[in-house]
């Protein structure tokens, strides 16, 4: 073992241990939240570096997004007494229950971080060498991915040109997509396309994928709909790391600049008139708090539980599976989400949801522990697939799981089932084409 790697492991171990002790101190009212937050930030940074070196790309990207979506507000709170200064309306979900929210979010992220470190250090299984980015994967999966990307881009432009999709403001955009059910499926296939393409692309061809993706990414950023960019791009970044693609410093700087300056500028510029351009005021924390606002559903869930509502012991995870089987098993009734406590989109309309909040609603802190453990094991398993075809499937599922960070679980089983069906169909086609080629 090289000396540099040993030093990294020691530093990483110390930061994890320090975060655990500071968190215990916080729970016993001995340490303030700022110390815990700073400690956790350092631990996350060291863990991300270790995961990158060990090519655990799926764990890496999931951890980053889990942290940003649940700790963006707390990180801002280190510097600002009121991190929600740009927000109005009912903010009691945060201010009344800040300590409880902080404890739950810290426990979840620290659990994920500790397990990721443990697997990275002690696991003897590493990504297959044949996945190296210098090699090209399955051609059928690669070109199917490109087809899905181009297909959704055409659909997106068609909706805009025909006036069915409004892009004047983010509010208009959200309202118009409610009337376009096929748009949601288009986005889903777009994310599958990105997963398939980057799982099988050769290093010298990455630039062509970037060219194909750039128009669509710009359209999403202009409309203010960043989610459709983050989920698939993060999964693509994850699989590139698994495939030993080297991330350059200029790439990291570009991402940070885009996140903290370009996107906030677009948001401000799109909501102002030409006479007030000189009054543009971009706050460094705007994007961080907006991403971290995903914490809000957890605030409501803890209020429900503290108010006497019972935890549901996994029912919200079983409900979508029951709904799938209700189509094929006579007499099995689908779950009516409007009639149950875990119909989150009806209880908190337009709010999205939160993976930690749903885990807490199902099993309190034990539920959070179980979900974090399962996620780490799943993401680790996807990293260790041995064929490009399975890696493609794993990357597509990772995109769904990243999407789930800011949404309820209800869509996840159906999306995973669709991905599996697509992969099976492509495997049959690929097998047939190879047989035909041999016959010729």
From Swiss-Prot:
Pathway: Capsule biogenesis; capsule polysaccharide biosynthesis. It is found in: Cell membrane. It is a multi-pass membrane protein. The chain crosses the membrane at residues 7-27, 31-51, 60-80, 102-122, 141-161, 179-199, 204-224, 249-269, 324-344, 360-380, 382-402, 409-429. InterPro entries: O-ag_pol_Wzy. Keywords: Capsule biogenesis/degradation, Cell membrane, Exopolysaccharide synthesis, Membrane, Transmembrane, Transmembrane helix. It comes from the Bacteria. The keyword Secreted does not apply. One of its GO terms (biological process) is capsule polysaccharide biosynthetic process. GO terms for cellular component: plasma membrane. Required for the biosynthesis of type 1 capsular polysaccharide. This is Protein CapE. It comes from Staphylococcus aureus. The gene is capE.
């Amino acid at each position: 073992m090289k000396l540099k790697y040993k030093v990294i492991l020691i530093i990483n171990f110390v930061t994890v241990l320090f975060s655990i002790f500071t968190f215990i101190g916080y729970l016993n009212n001995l340490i303030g939240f700022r110390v815990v937050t700073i400690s956790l930030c350092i631990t996350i940074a060291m863990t991300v570096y270790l995961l990158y070196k060990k090519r655990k790309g799926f764990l890496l990207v999931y951890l980053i997004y889990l942290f940003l979506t649940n700790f963006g507000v707390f990180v801002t709170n280190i510097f600002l007494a009121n991190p929600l200064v740009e927000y109005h309306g009912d903010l009691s979900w945060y201010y009344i229950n800040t300590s409880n929210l902080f404890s739950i979010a810290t426990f979840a992220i620290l659990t994920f971080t500790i397990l990721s470190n443990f697997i990275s250090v002690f696991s003897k299984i590493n990504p297959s060498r044949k996945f190296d980015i210098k090699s090209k994967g399955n051609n059928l999966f690669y070109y199917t991915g490109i087809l899905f990307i181009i297909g959704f881009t055409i659909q997106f432009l068609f909706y805009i040109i025909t006036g069915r999709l409004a892009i004047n403001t983010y509010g208009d955009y959200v309202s118009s997509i409610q009337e376009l059910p096929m748009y949601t499926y288009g986005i889903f296939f777009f994310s599958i396309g990105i997963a398939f393409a980057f799982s099988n692309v050769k290093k010298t061809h990455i630039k062509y994928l970037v060219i194909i993706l750039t128009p669509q990414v710009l359209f999403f950023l202009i409309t203010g709909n960043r989610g459709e960019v983050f989920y698939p791009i993060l999964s693509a970044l994850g699989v590139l790391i698994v495939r030993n693609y080297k991330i350059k410093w200029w790439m990291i700087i570009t991402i940070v600049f885009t996140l903290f300056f370009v996107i906030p500028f677009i948001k401000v510029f799109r909501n102002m008139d030409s006479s007030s351009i000189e009054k543009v005021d971009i706050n460094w924390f705007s994007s961080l708090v907006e991403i971290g606002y995903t914490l809000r559903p957890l605030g409501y869930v803890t209020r429900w539980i503290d108010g006497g509502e019972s935890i549901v012991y996994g029912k919200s995870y079983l409900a979508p599976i029951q709904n799938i089987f209700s189509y094929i098993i006579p007499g099995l009734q689908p779950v009516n989400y409007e009639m149950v406590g875990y119909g989150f989109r009806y209880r908190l309309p337009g709010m999205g949801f939160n993976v930690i909040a749903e885990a807490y609603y199902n099993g309190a802190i034990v539920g959070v522990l179980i979900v974090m453990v399962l996620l780490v094991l799943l993401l680790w398993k996807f990293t260790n697939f041995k064929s490009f075809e399975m890696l493609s499937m794993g990357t597509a599922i990772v995109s769904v799981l990243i999407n789930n960070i800011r949404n309820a679980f209800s869509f996840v089983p159906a999306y995973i089932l669709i991905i599996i069906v697509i992969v099976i169909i492509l495997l049959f086609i690929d097998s047939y084409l190879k047989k035909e080629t041999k016959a010729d």
